[in-house]
UniProtKB/Swiss-Prot annotation:
One of its GO terms (molecular function) is ATP binding. Residues 1-84 are annotated as: Domain I, interacts with DnaA modulators. InterPro entries: AAA+_ATPase (IPR003593), Chromosome_initiator_DnaA (IPR001957), Chromosome_initiator_DnaA-like (IPR020591), Chromosome_initiator_DnaA_CS (IPR018312), DnaA_C (IPR013159), DnaA_dom (IPR013317), DnaA_N_dom (IPR024633), DnaA_N_sf (IPR038454). GO terms for cellular component: cytoplasm; plasma membrane. The keyword tRNA-binding does not apply. It comes from Shewanella sp. (strain W3-18-1). ATP binds at residues 169, 171-173. This is Chromosomal replication initiator protein DnaA. The gene is dnaA. Pfam families: Bac_DnaA (PF00308), Bac_DnaA_C (PF08299), DnaA_N (PF11638), Hda_lid (PF22688). Belongs to the DnaA family. Residues 125-341 are annotated as: Domain III, AAA+ region.
Amino acid sequence: MAVSLWQQCIGRLQDELPAQQFSMWIRPLQAEMDGDTLVLYAPNRFVLDWVREKYINIINQFFTEQMGSDAPKLRFDIGSRPSAKKFEPAPVATVRAPNTQTKATVGTYFNTQAEPIANANHRSNINPTYQFDNFVEGKSNQLGKAAALQVAENPGGAYNPLFLYGGTGLGKTHLLHAVGNGIIKNNPNAKVVYMHSERFVQDMVKALQNNAIEEFKRYYRSVDALFIDDIQFFANKDRSQEEFFHTFNALLEGNHQIILTSDRYPKEIDGVEDRLKSRFGWGLTVAIEPPELETRVAILMRKAQESGINLPDEVAFFIAKRLRSNVRELEGALNRVIANANFTGRPITIDFVREALRDLLALQEKLVTIDNIQKTVAEYYKIKMADMLSKRRSRSVARPRQVAMALSKELTNQSLPEIGDAFGGRDHTTVLHACRKIAQLREESHDIKEDYANLIRTLSS
């Protein structure tokens, strides 16, 4: 009875919570009765603590509404309910003896004649240097890291497939490798394959050329976990999409983990079949956004520490405030500073950094101005540039104006009064309100979150 009530509660939560929150925190929970107590199993401590803090009152309220004083007690535990199916390595397949007349090697990942596919090394290409421990977490990537951690602990479970999307250089590939390392640590025999989508296409083409398509299928469908980076490169490659469609289905039916990354939201990927885009969203879709200031500073400090360099706090903030687009750009700039310091023997100060990065900083200041932000936002929302400066308060105009103010605060070094002046002489408190409002809406509204991320990418590219 109580387990059935939990299913009703799930239905209520699904209606009330944003889809991403529901998928992230509620869907992984498993329920089982223990006497008069309903035990909710969370996959790890992170989820358990989050649900206790954020959702326990909603759950208890629902139970009380439905059963009054007969409502079951609640207890939380970590793990799976005893009846839950656990992750197992993929079964070893058998294949025919190789055709000795076939001489060509197909791709990098399997050979048409060297050895039976089942016994071949599934070359994972998992980079051991990419771990969760050295992934700098911030608000922009917190959900992505949490989801990746859960997949590493319970591959083939609730988040399957896991789809990570965001601009270049934001850490999506790092998370893929971290998951792979986590799975292999827990199960050294697991067959984990990481690749760029173009490698999948190249392997399939070579398999077709060498009449080895069956070996290709057996190889990819016998892995325990398949991670494909930059899935958007499947666009307009119909045969590759067809083969991946069947590979995807086979792996999912066997409860084997799939993680995909892209530079855009699944439904926005042009040239990919709708049936594939639909499947990309079956599990959990998480945005990886450009890092906020505090995370950018932490990334610089971590990188400097790894390089054995003492980076002053004020220098880290100086760089982080001016380079905002992605982690790769930050690390490249720091490497340049370190190289210059080693070459000249000069201490790393703000003046030294300003000189070492003068061309890069000049380019950034030229590209990101309040005027440029206003024009970009106006074009994005299809409003007139004059509306940015007007007193109109209709939502169709006011919301884009607030977005532009928030972007100006984040992407330029202008003060709140200066931003207000640029928006028709508004008071600095109006700008502050706009920034807070957009920050709130990015948490609550998927559309605003997407719009903001798209504009950041456009302005930072």
